[in-house]
């Protein structure tokens, strides 16, 4: 068999290596490549298009695209208006703030966002988290002005955090919210949100401030004397209507407009019923009078000092992470369906600046919602102009239609919220996770039950902590396997995976399947020593020749640090004492370079013990074995 040499990598300066490492870490998409070799005018145009994606598609915009965007924009507006009012109440904010948040942020996103399908506005989970975290220290009833100030300040910090992640290209931080974590978190939050609506659906006036399931259910059954049969009847009727339209649209996607228009129709019909029958005099709670006009400025309400600074910063951080994760996940989902690319870092900047601007214009945390984006996509949206159309529709509502909402019953808003969040409970995905990875399923359950029985933020923290623990376990306890030869071939595979694979007498072939660093070097030392001892005992029992070669297959070792180098040096000393030669197979360039630097005495990086494949190593060493052992 021909033996190929392992060559040292081309020399690179430290600066060049650092530059390459930083580029691959923070700029894997190489955004500057489009500027190379271009005249200055072209560079300026492309820079403007990169910062403002609207400039990319705006010159080619046509009337046919406008027709599609107008239809989709009006469709999502019919959903955004009742949802905006409902989600604001979920966040313990005045209902009008929900409409403000459906006006300004979509305009900002239309200019800065890169997704064609993302429909921007308030979302249930971020609303729940914002309201619950702020209410722990400030009552929205006793001090509504301060509560509103803290909500806007939290929105500013959320936007600042989101935009900073995009500018610094640190989006990988949100990847710690794994799919299992999100499914459990969203499912638990959906149940908590639904339970919170029991206050409105039953007509209860005195309700607990806690969010977990036990206090909520206790409060519901402790105040049965406050239950209003009129409210219950209206709530059940509209809830059944909304759930029926949702089920119909799921069964027949072409009828998406049925579920999209159902919330607005429910608001209109219920408002007419309350107005005609004066139901507010018979126990039906209504929104009340809402102010007319566009968003008033709120930058003077932002708080950057005082005793509540830590609260708003923490609330902004949590809501920022959750809303950013949801927005990017939704954007990427629909981009994949339509075969176009969404730049994650651009999205972070767009969503972040959208919230920063929103905090100064009486808006609270917004992002791209899955329900509205799905409707936007089904309605035929072609560009972000659909967000502009939705925003203009909300503007008209704010200017001229606000008196119509005075008699809108709160119970219908609760029914709208329950219908919207029930889709967040994804049982098929949970079953899929159970089949694939039991630990991920455990993480999902911890997130789910943590949200339900503790709090939204604690449930999220537990799930993220378990995800980090899983990553640490994978880093500190890397996979390492014994390899054997598949008879009749030159292929070497895991002995425990391929039962036909056979270990070669006199050789111990180990495959390390991770970088070797300070976190796992001690574990690898103990694991390797144990296998050497077991192999020697096995050789003695079967009366084979003694173990002569320890072969390390290193194709998956992408890097080593100082501790990793020490691991190999100590391993060489250990094997030398046992008259065993240490052999390296296919070490990568970074590993070769560092080991050669550390091997000043040329003790273990000798060419005769470096091979490209395990088969070449075994074939070559089998011929030279006895002589090489004494070199």
UniProtKB/Swiss-Prot annotation:
Entry keywords, A to Z: Membrane, Sulfate transport, Symport, Transmembrane, Transmembrane helix, Transport
Localization per Swiss-Prot or TrEMBL: Membrane
UniProt name for this protein: Probable sulfate transporter 3.3
GO cellular component terms, A-Z: membrane
Described purpose of this protein according to its UniProt entry: H(+)/sulfate cotransporter that may play a role in the regulation of sulfate assimilation.
SUPFAM superfamilies: SpoIIaa-like
Family of this protein: Belongs to the SLC26A/SulP transporter (TC 2.A.53) family.
Topological region Cytoplasmic: 1-69, 114-117, 166-171, 245-256, 331-347, 406-410, 463-631
Transmembrane segments: 70-90, 93-113, 118-138, 145-165, 172-192, 224-244, 257-277, 310-330, 348-368, 385-405, 411-431, 442-462
Superkingdom of the source species: Eukaryota
Bilayer topology term: Multi-pass membrane protein
Pfam families in the cross-refs: STAS, Sulfate_transp
Chief location: membrane
GO molecular function: secondary active sulfate transmembrane transporter activity; symporter activity
